[in-house]
Each structure stands twice: as C-alpha cells, then as structure tokens.
Amino acid sequence: MAEGAAGREDPAPPDAAGGEDDPRVGPDAAGDCVTAASGGRMRDRRSGVALPGAAGTPADSEAGLLEAARATPRRSSIIKDPSNQKCGGRKKTVSFSSMPSEKKISSANDCISFMQAGCELKKVRPNSRIYNRFFTLDTDLQALRWEPSKKDLEKAKLDISAIKEIRLGKNTETFRNNGLADQICEDCAFSILHGENYESLDLVANSADVANIWVSGLRYLVSRSKQPLDFMEGNQNTPRFMWLKTVFEAADVDGNGIMLEDTSVELIKQLNPTLKEAKIRLKFKEIQKSKEKLTTRVTEEEFCEAFCELCTRPEVYFLLVQISKNKEYLDANDLMLFLEAEQGVTHITEDICLDIIRRYELSEEGRQKGFLAIDGFTQYLLSSECDIFDPEQKKVAQDMTQPLSHYYINASHNTYLIEDQFRGPADINGYIRALKMGCRSVELDVSDGSDNEPILCNRNNMTTHVSFRSVIEVINKFAFVASEYPLILCLGNHCSLPQQKVMAQQMKKVFGNKLYTEAPLPSESYLPSPEKLKRMIIVKGKKLPSDPDVLEGEVTDEDEEAEMSRRMSVDYNGEQKQIRLCRELSDLVSICKSVQYRDFELSMKSQNYWEMCSFSETEASRIANEYPEDFVNYNKKFLSRIYPSAMRIDSSNLNPQDFWNCGCQIVAMNFQTPGPMMDLHTGWFLQNGGCGYVLRPSIMRDEVSYFSANTKGILPGVSPLALHIKIISGQNFPKPKGACAKGDVIDPYVCIEIHGIPADCSEQRTKTVQQNSDNPIFDETFEFQVNLPELAMIRFVVLDDDYIGDEFIGQYTIPFECLQPGYRHVPLRSFVGDIMEHVTLFVHIAITNRSGGGKAQKRSLSVRMGKKVREYTMLRNIGLKTIDDIFKIAVHPLREAIDMRENMQNAIVSIKELCGLPPIASLKQCLLTLSSRLITSDNTPSVSLVMKDSFPYLEPLGAIPDVQKKMLTAYDLMIQESRFLIEMADTVQEKIVQCQKAGMEFHEELHNLGAKEGLKGRKLNKATESFAWNITVLKGQGDLLKNAKNEAIENMKQIQLACLSCGLSKAPSSSAEAKSKRSLEAIEEKESSEENGKL
C-alpha cells in the first residue's frame, strides 16, 4: 500500500490538468450530486446506472438547470380530482429512439467494468477541503488510482490488498467533523478504510447509483482478494444464467437454440408479469441492432441478456451484494442475518430461512442447494412478507376493554349518499360500502314516506329515496362482516309520531336482540367497553324523560342542516326548533343520548356519561382553538361526534386529524368523496385489524394528565422518536388519470407527509426523476422528529412534476405505529383508494430514540450531543406548599432516570459510530462489524466473550492494536451503562411512582386546597394545569425508564447471541452453548424475581 492514500495532500495549482485540482471549499463542493464527468465520459441519467459511453457525449447542463429550478417543495396535500385536471404548462416529450446511452448494473462484472473505465469523485480531507479527482481501477484489479495529483503515480494509488473495510454513507470522523458534512449527500458518500490503523479515504460520488457501484465493486474485490478472479470471464456460468438457459431450453421445442420473438416475449412476461410487452420487444430490437442483425428470432444468449437487463433492479442487486458478503446470492445464514439485523424479525431460524428460499427462489438448483438469487430475492422483497404494514396490526391488537369514550371510532356522514349532498341520490350501496370498510357509526336521516313507510332521501332535492326498512335490513346483514365491535346508528329523526312508531317497530323486528337497550347504571362513571358491546347495535338519538307515563313529548331538534339555515336566514333568532318524539323510539336510545353542548364547565358538572354531544365542524374548530386542553379532558369521559360543515355543499371532507388531536372519537366523513382527507381517515383505521376502533394515546385517556391539542413542542413524559425514511425507488408508476401529455412519459417525485399533533406535522420531497415510470431511482434519505408517535401518520404521495399543477399518481397512508423497519415495499393506492397492482415504492424505514428538542432535519451525533447541556424535563410549581414539597422529592430521581437512559443511548451510538454505522443501525449489525475487526489474519478471534454476572464482556486474548483497544473501550462503556440501568432502574422507578401516588392523593381536594390558599380564577386553573403536568411527567418518565430497562435486557441477549454466531466465544461445545443459553435468561429471571418480591 502506498502512503499517498492517507498522507498530506496540498491543493494542486490552478494550472494543473483540466483545472480541476483546485480544492472546492464551500457549498458548491458537494451540494450537487449530479455533475458532468470529465474525460468525455457519460454521466448518470438518474433513470438508471450509467456505464461508460462513447467519448465526446455532451454534458446535459440544461437538464441540470431545470432540475434545480424544480427543487422548490410543493404542497402535495392539495390533490386535485384527476377527472378535472386540465392541460397546461410544458409539453412532455417522447423519444422514439430507444438505443440506450446507459446500461443497468446487473452483476459484479458490470461494477468492475464501470470502475475500470473510471469516473470523477470528490475526495474529502479532514481539513474540510474537497478535491475533484478521477478514480480508476487498474486493469489487473490490484489497485485504485486517482489523478490529477502532485504525488508520484505510484503514490496516488491504493492497493486493494490494503483495504480493510468499505463504508457507505457519512460514517467516518472526516465526514462527521467536516464543516461541509451537512452539505454532502448521505447516499453519495462512501469511505475506504485501509492499513493497520484503519485510515480513511473519504469520497463523494456524483450520484447514489455511482456510490453504490464503487462500494459493491470494492467489497467484491476485497472479498475475492484471496481467490482467483475468474468472474471477469463473463456471467455465463452464474446460477442465474444457468437457470435462464434451462428455462429457454424447455421452451425451445425444436432444440436448435433459437426461438421466435413472440415466444420469447411471452416467456419473459410469464417470468415477470409487471413488464410491458412493448418494452420487451424494444429491448430485443436494441440487442439485435447492437449486433447489426435484424430478425424476428432470438438466441439463447439474447434471451438471457434481455431478461437480465429488463428484470434486474440495480438497487436490489446492490442490497443483495451488501448482505451476501459480496456473493451474487444469499444462503440461509445470509438471509437470517438480514432478517434479524435489518428487518427486525425475531425468533428466526435456519429452517425458516430455508423455507423462504424454497418458496421464492425461481431456479430448481437454488431451491435444492438453499440459496436465493437476485430474482428470487426481488420476489421476496415484493411479497406480503416484506410489506411496510405490521402484520400484527392486521388483527385486533389493542386492549378492547377500555370505556367506549377511549377509542377513535370509524364514522360516516350522510351514509345514504353516493354523490354530493345537493345532487346525490339516496342509495343503499352507501351503507354496504361503509360497513365493508369497517365503519362503526353510520347516519340515517329519516323522513316521512308514503303509505306510512319511513324513507331515507336527500332532503335537498327529494328526487330519489330508499325505504327505512330496506336500509336497516342491509345494515343488519353487513353490520358485523368487517368488525364484531358495536355499530352506532346516528338517527336523524324528521318523522311524524306515527312513522316514528313504525321506525321503532321495524328496528325491533329486524335487529332483534342485537339492539342495545339496557338502561345505563348511575353507579358507573364510564361507558361500557367495545368488548362488552360486541355485536350490539346502539341507537344514538333524542330521549324523553324516564317517566313511563309520558308517551310522547317535545325535544330539541339538532338537525345538522340547521347550521345552513342559521347561516342563510336573516330571521333566525337563536331559538332551537322543537320536535315531537314518541316513547317507542325514545326507549331504543340507551347509552348514546343526544344532548346539546353548552360549555365545558357545565358539562363536567351535570352531563351524564351516557349523554353525548354533536358538534359542527365550525363549532368544533372554534372550541379546539380556544379551549384545547378542556376539549381533551371532556373527551376522556364523553363521546363527541364531529360532522362536516353544511357549507361543504360538494360533500368535501374536513381534516379528521384536527379533531383526533382533541380526542374527539366520532369524526364523521363523507365516504363518497375521495381525496387526501379520506386517505388519512382510511389509513388511520387500517390498524387494529380494521375493526373500526382505535385506542387513543394514554396521555389522552388518563384521568390526570396534561395534553394540549395545539402543542408545538415535546410532550411531558413522552420520549420523541426519530423516523428515518429512505425513498429508494418506484415501480411501475401509471400515467396520471386525466393527464394531457401524449405517450406514457412521466416525471415522478415523492412527497413524505407527517400528520399528527402540530409539533409533528412536516413535509419533505425527493428530487424529480425525468421520464421514468418503470423504475425511477430516488435514493434520498429524510429524518423527522415524532413527538407523539401514537397519533402520527405517514403519507407517501407520488406526483408527476409539471409546471402547472403536479398530477396525482398514487399514495399510501399508514399509522406510525404500524410501520415495519427495514427494506419494505409500499403498495400505492389510486385516487379513489384502490390498491394498484404492481405499483409500489421501495423504501427503508428506521426508528431511533431522540434526545432534545427541535425539528429533526439533521442527524444529531452523540459526540455533539455530549457537548451540550443536557435538558431535563422540569416539574412545575403549583403554589400549594404541601403538594410542591411532595413533587420536589421527585426532582432527583427524575434526573437519575433521564441520565441513565441518555447515557446508555449515547454509549450505544458511540460504539455504532466507531463501527462506521449510522445511529439507525441495529446492535446485531454493530456486533457483526465489530467481530470483523477483531478477527486476525489467520481467521482467529483476538478477543473472547466472557460472561460476568450474566453480562457479556469481551476480553483480549493477547496484545491488540490501539484501534481495537479503542473499540473495546467503547464496547465496555456500553455494557457498563446498560448494566447500571438494569440494576438501578427498579429503585429509581419506585421513587418516581411513590411521588406520583403521593401527589394523586391530593387530586380530589385540589380545588378546595387552592380555594383555602386564596387561589381562584386563572391562578386556580394554572395550579390545576401544573398539577396535571407534574403527574404526566412522573408517569411518563417512570414508563420510559421501565421500557429502557427492558430494551437493555434485550440488548444484552442480542449481543451474546451475536458474539456466539460471530465466533467470539471460546468454547463452541454443547455444554458451553447450554451455559450461554442459561446466561441469556439469568438477567431476566433475576429481574422477574425482584419484581415478584415487591408484589
């Protein structure tokens, strides 16, 4: 190895070759990841990975300027109805010549060829200087070289044999401490560690694709450095090509090695149904034209070449090479490590992995020998097993025994309409659709019909109607098809007394014992649970006083349409209309009695738990803005129903998130109107098995807790999380419905929207990929801080970039709690909410803990965080000495709890950084990397796993280099901090819990105590708010500490298992393995016994 790779390098003079040797210091140095390469070589087109082309190809500078102009974010939330989109803006162009200027990367051979041709990379120095250099791989594959350089040619090189490790991303000290690091694209950066001291050569490519080529190629060369490099002979003997030959020969009935083009096209479509026939035919023509032949017959070689170019997704190939230790296939062990370390799958075994291989590998040889090649791996990643949605949430997974008021309830507005509320006819299919979608609250707006038969109709036009009886028969049939949990019928009664009696009789007859009519118990304080009300139908409506002698009476008419009347009428005097109600209909109303809202103070004093209020969107918005805390507290006990403003004459939808943030349970939506708001609603209720009930966050359920719907900061007692999303690629994007451009040309980009409390709302977008709908590569990473994960949703939106109105392609909305980590495919939905076949986004998801406040736009490293003053959640002064003295006792335990959690997290991040891994990496990945550093040249470990008091320590087996000492020191610190937390957590948590209990003893008398001390009005309210804040902090920090302890215990288990699998254990005998297994359980058993002793 030449020392030139890491030695001092002065900036080259301005007159050096091409003038490119001047260091570029500043934003221009790394802000643009796509720049023209020197030497007449073609640059990346962003529609695929470019291999070298002919010299003299002009640089696409105009396209670069257009890309920069389009970089301004747009509001993707404003999605227009595609049927109303009009032509306008620039025209999209279609090229009818398809000879490619680039070739996809589909093998290691392609990577090596690219590296030998060379390309420009930016070389980053520790002094923050950046140099443009042209890097190439020697023809003998033994060294990297770069130019221009002031060094001798033999020094401006790096021997492949000296390379220890290749890291993708900004994961070295040079990148982390460089002043320009924030301006360097994470996905374009990579580092080559070399020499005994692991010095780093830090580089930035012009695109993520180019970075992936270099990383994959170098890893392949390093892994093969001790083996003959015979792969350069070509790809003809790889398992993939052998399988394709078998497929071709089976279809070649004549056995002459030639097949009709039509037959070849059909065969490739059978192997990959997502491909378009026209694209396959075009590929054959390209291949034949390159060979200067024109024929309608295809050879075996041409068939294999076409299939590999059409069906190889470069981003999947790079991933496979990365996790397979640079083979071009995965064995069972590779797959097991991928599932455990990257996908977060637990309890995985070799047999499970072999079963996956047998189900997804396409070749018979692969299935028999137990390996998964690129095509089978692609199929596996596209399968439901790698869906982004957590399969546990596809069934009922939440506690269903809480009071009804503790759940969000899937609700429909104007269920009987299938169009807008002015022109739309009444239709029975509206109920069928809503109930099949898991709706648990439907609306029946009933009026008098002819022949004493109540009807449902659109009272704005009275054109068509359906009979009340037919509607409730349909409801009875479909009520519990999608969910067994209770169905609420919101009765809009506009009938005369005789027809009210008919309604009551028909409901009794059709629903029978499904009708819930039990009188509420005054001794109870909360509504029954969904579990207790399973398969029951609850009628919401007006109710007469309980006097049985009163057979009929007047009640207030809270017709939703009265809002419009009040707005439109100049004669409205504020008095509510009275209607007559019969006893028979009144008796069907039990635990959902409609009452009028006055104010929160009156409601909290006099409202019964079985009474509920309906709020118009306008009124609810006003209340949410003026009294956010009161609204949340009110909804802990009482049900609230929110319905869209009557001014929405087009039946557009309100934003349900605004009212879910206030704890409102029944936010009624116009199911007949698709769009972003309905996407949020549909996505939210996919969780918990789609049963129509979603448990609200505990901070919105606890009797004493502090939460404001308008909060824009960190919540007391809730630890914010960092959500890392990498948008890798898209697959098979359709042309937008109603788009005006000819052909299938689209310029897609992706928006990521975070919906939740105001503190969490955020939006980011990718770059635009020009003219690529089949497999656009985005390769962009985003990070978001999520303060209340239980109430957050992520919406992926794909749009077609246009100067006038970006057109909708597809979207997918998912609750934060349903995200699966790792590499996942996102199935996109159409504008009306239907899943589009084969249309997906390929993403990587990671969720990590985050300390401190502020929006998470840039990664905070532990080294930097350690220099900051640690922020502690502070308790508030109430103004009542007795209570304040109790809460003061908790100050020290709270600081201890926060210190233990943060110290452990910082120690974990530090060891990850030393391993060259980002904070999102798992400890399993960390130990795999660490073990590779601790294995000597003769393949023996330099350290050994030693269990001390059931904790996994690593001890040197002799003298070790300073680099390894540094890593072991960081590892020991992680174990020490984890051990300290595990051993001290229960004691500290007990102190916090005791302070919380002591404080809660004053809860009932808080107002009286405040009055005695002279607190009243705003001061008393402030004292009550501060008391709730303190209780919330204590409960939350206690729970966080308990969770941190469980996490630490699980980490110790994973570390020990990883050490065993990586060969860092002295004795692999069965007795040693049994002893290790017992050690895994020792900590947990010890902790369990201590907990049981306290009970």
From Swiss-Prot:
Sequence segments annotated as region (Interaction with PPP1C): 83-222
Quaternary structure (record): Interacts with PPP2CA. Interacts with Ins(1,4,5)P3, Ins(1,4,5,6)P4, GABARAP, GABA receptor beta subunits, GABA receptor gamma-2 subunits and PPP1C. May form a ternary complex with GABA receptor beta subunit and GABARAP. The formation of a ternary complex with GABA receptor beta subunit and GABARAP could be the key step for facilitating the association of GABARAP with the GABA receptor gamma-2 subunit and to allow it to be transported at the right destination.
Positions bearing Phosphothreonine: 93, 556
PI-PLC Y-box domain segment(s): 585-701
In-chain residues carrying the UniProt-annotated modification Phosphoserine: 47, 77, 95, 569, 1079
The keyword Cytoplasm belongs to this UniProt entry's keyword annotation: yes
Protein source organism: Homo sapiens
GO biological process: gamma-aminobutyric acid signaling pathway; intracellular signal transduction; negative regulation of cold-induced thermogenesis; phosphatidylinositol metabolic process; phosphatidylinositol-mediated signaling; regulation of synaptic transmission, GABAergic; release of sequestered calcium ion into cytosol
SUPFAM superfamilies named in the record: C2 domain (Calcium/lipid-binding domain, CaLB), EF-hand, PH domain-like, PLC-like phosphodiesterases
Compartments in which it is found: Cytoplasm
The PH domain, residue ranges: 113-223
Bilayer-crossing regions: none
Annotated PI-PLC X-box domain residues: 398-542
Role summary: Involved in an inositol phospholipid-based intracellular signaling cascade. Shows no PLC activity to phosphatidylinositol 4,5-bisphosphate and phosphatidylinositol. Component in the phospho-dependent endocytosis process of GABA A receptor. Regulates the turnover of receptors and thus contributes to the maintenance of GABA-mediated synaptic inhibition. Its aberrant expression could contribute to the genesis and progression of lung carcinoma. Acts as an inhibitor of PPP1C.
UniProt-recorded name of the protein: Inactive phospholipase C-like protein 1
GO cellular component: a single term: cytoplasm
Region feature (Disordered): 1-61, 1066-1095
MF-aspect GO terms: phosphatidylinositol-4,5-bisphosphate phospholipase C activity; phospholipase C activity
Post-translational modification: Phosphorylated by the catalytic subunit of PKA. Phosphorylation of Thr-93 resulted in dissociation of PPP1C from PRIP1.
Domain C2, first and last residues per copy: 701-830
Tissue: Expressed in a variety of fetal and adult organs including brain, lung and kidney. Its expression was greatly reduced in small and non-small cell lung carcinoma. Isoform 1 is predominantly expressed in brain.
Region described as Interaction with GABA A beta subunit: 543-567
Biased composition (Basic and acidic residues): 1-11, 1074-1095
